[in-house]
Amino acid sequence: MKALDELTFDNRFARLGDAFSTHVLPEPLDEPRLVVASNAAMALLDLDPAVAETPVFAELFSGHKLWAEAEPRAMIYSGHQFGGYTPQLGDGRGLLLGEVYNEAGEHWDLHLKGAGMTPYSRMGDGRAVLRSSIREFLASEALHALGIPSSRALCVIGSSTPVWREKQERGAMVLRLAPSHIRFGHFEYFYYTRKPEQQAELAEHVLNLHYPECREQPEPYLAMFREIVERNAEMIAKWQAYGFCHGVMNTDNMSILGITFDFGPFAFLDDFDAHFICNHSDHEGRYSFSNQVPIGQWNLSALAQALTPFISVDALKEALGLYLPLYQAHYLDLMRRRLGLTTAEDDDQQMVERLLKLMQNSGVDYTLFFRRLGDESAALAVARLRDDFVDMAGFDAWAEQYKERVARDADSSEEQRRERMHAVNPLYILRNYLAQNAITAAESGDYSEVRRLHEVLSRPFEEQAGMEQYAQRPPDWGKHLEISCSS
């Protein structure tokens, strides 16, 4: 394991030059202090977890100190926001400190969010508040633990720096890790500003560093786009299967690597609601839970438009046509596993859709239903779950179909089925009310609840003694909370 001063930097994006980003120094926070750190994320950098408790750790990730090899840069990009094109966005409060490569040969961006004003801050102050920083930290690590592709979060550093939003709050910084922070909006920026040389340089950078296997294909850029389509289809399939609502699927929030990125007013479903809107600024429901699948395709088409200098329109359309079949295949595979099934049958999609409609009409807790379905035999489980449904006759009909399907599928013992289902059906998810409880405590200086919640969510499939309160249905006040983009 390494100390903080032993990290090895290789700042590949910074070497692209000033057309792609601007050198900016972070603005330090007052009286920085560690709120929470992820041992699993620190392991990606080969860091000894003990370094999180040292004073220099808080100083490095609050803007007070920098590694000599760091090259902090604010990236420039544009994007479609709620369907309308915004010509220039960029890192308005985040800085790419540099890229660190670990002993496994992996490169990880170190991105400090809340680091102060940049040339792209527009009307913002460049700061992030403790509330939003804790939410991003918890979500990043929770999604990773669920097996959903995501950026990672190393730590949150709190402070006494005042920041004004709807009210006065305290400033914080979160250190985000990802193999790359390049977004769909990077390509859109150079396409719409008609800078073909820089756009070609960016495309080569992404191809060589992040999709090198596509170099071997007859049309490398087309192969890369197909891979981006597949990764996004798989990511969104996992969002839908686990009930994750992103909230702000603008193209500047879409990673070129197909990982969940830029956490804002996100939420996991409590009661199943296909039309749930987690962002109270989304008045039209553009980014509602059920719209995430078509919006994923819309965003990929926006990226495709920006790639027309490298790929023919017909080839791009053909690649985009792969999205929905790929999504459906990934989604149905995961939903079969959540139902404890190991084989595929033609009627499985209809059976899943029928169940979700029943859950919608009865307000059934999405996460706990699947967990309890695997607690015992199919017959006993559905008998116990029956009372959760208003339409009992409808549920009984579904239950008969399900039991027959399980009987045809059965090639293992009940214990093996239970273990298989519990391995894909979490007991603990990041419910908004749990995050809010942790934030409320942290805002009064008590970080123990944030740390405990993080630890619980790092093992979502494993029953943890004494942590029953994290596996309950939310109280009425905690259901379907709408979160603002104010962060």
Language model: regions and residue ranges:
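Regulatory N- and C-terminal appendages and interdomain linkers associated
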Residues: 1-77, 278, 283-487
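N-proximal short alpha-helices
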Residues: 7-15, 112, 116, 126, ...
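Conserved ATP-binding subdomain of kinase catalytic cores across diverse folds
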Residues: 31-34, 40-57, 62-216, 257-259, ...
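ATP-dependent phospho-/nucleotidyl transfer catalytic cores
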Residues: 133, 162-246, 257-357
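Catalytic-loop Lys-Pro-X-Asn motif of eukaryotic-like protein kinases
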Residues: 251-252, 256
